[in-house]
Amino acid sequence: MKKDFKIGCIGSGFIMKDCQIPAYKSAGFHVSCIASRSKDKAKEVALNHNIPVVYDSIDEMLEHGDFDILDIAVPPEAQPEIIMKALEQSKKLRGILAQKPLAMDLLTAKNLVNACKQKSVTLAVNQNMRFDQSVRVAKSLLNSGKLGDIVLATIEMRAIPHWMPWAQGLKSLSTFIMSIHHLDTFRYWLGNPNLVFASTTKDPRTKFSHTDGVNLYILEYDSGARASSWDDVWAGPAKEGAGEDIYIRWRIEGTLGMAKGTIGWPKYPEKIPSTLEFTTVGDNGKWHSPVWNEVWFPDAFVGTMAQLLRAVELGIEPEISGDDNLLTIALCEAVMISASTHQAVNPSSLIESN
């Protein structure tokens, strides 16, 4: 894979400075320049990671920056404008790696996808949970057929995210920021569901106004498979003085085998690898437990950028393409609509109506 594409980074917050740029350095990718809403923060990141050029503003970098790939890590409401400006102003632009959510509504996301197509710029969306090591190995097991026909897949999250200040005022809190990871993972594992049932309640710890805190949802598939997640961002009064029981567990049950695992990120900044175990009907009760040293944050971010670089080099669609991500955004919309109407929602109908 060609690694010397020049990557221009926009943003200097946690995801960019602690996850994406360190991952790129470890993989040998070339970051050529950076800009942020705060030049001082951009300069600090550049100094820490030996990035040669810092621009005074995002607009200056978009117009004059020497980069082939644009890597964006900004709050979701700021992202669409940056993408549109990049398409208009950047001279050499060949690919964009956008943050999830691509946009906070399906129509805006569709417009961004179409605008990139019109400019022949490859768009990928940073759905990085797909590149968590246990999630990736689980997909390999599914592809191999070792688990048989899938009956049930579940994710149980009891973890406390650190909501950023920019989350206040968004139309969605948990669904478009946290649950989007699990919804996209179910799509990655099992494909697109036909119906969604959801219920949500507010997170008592979050003081600003919001509608979706603790999310519960069930996905129905025509194959008969079911998927469900409990996205519990409250996780008990662990921050208020009680003991804590923090974890994310997942499980996939098939007719020929099952797999289960844990996700390590709730222990961040301690680097705890995710885990996976699997067993099949031919194993006489034995469980297989592969191990690795890599962790979701930051190592999974190598995978998302590599997807884009490979797609640009070969002239193909990345697995995490803008078109694919529209289906994840539709699933997020379906969760919110179902929770508010107390009715099942078909995500495909939302794609067709927008």
Language model segments and positions:
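Beta-loop-alpha module in the N-terminal Rossmann-like domain of NAD(P)-dependent dehydrogenases
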Residues: H49, V53-A115
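N-terminal Rossmann-like dinucleotide-binding module
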Residues: M1-H49
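Hydrophobic residues in well-ordered beta-strands that form the structural core
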Residues: M16, Y55, L97-A98, L123-V125, ...
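Rossmann-fold dehydrogenase core element
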Residues: A109-M129, L147-I155
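C-terminal helix-rich "cap/oligomerization" subdomain common to oxidoreductases
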Residues: M1-K3, C9, I69-I72, K271, ...
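Predominantly a Rossmann-like dinucleotide-binding segment in NAD(P)-dependent oxidoreductases
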Residues: M129-I218, H342
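Contiguous beta-strand/loop segments that form the cofactor/metal-binding neighborhood of enzyme cores
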Residues: M1, I177, L183-Y268, V302-L314, ...
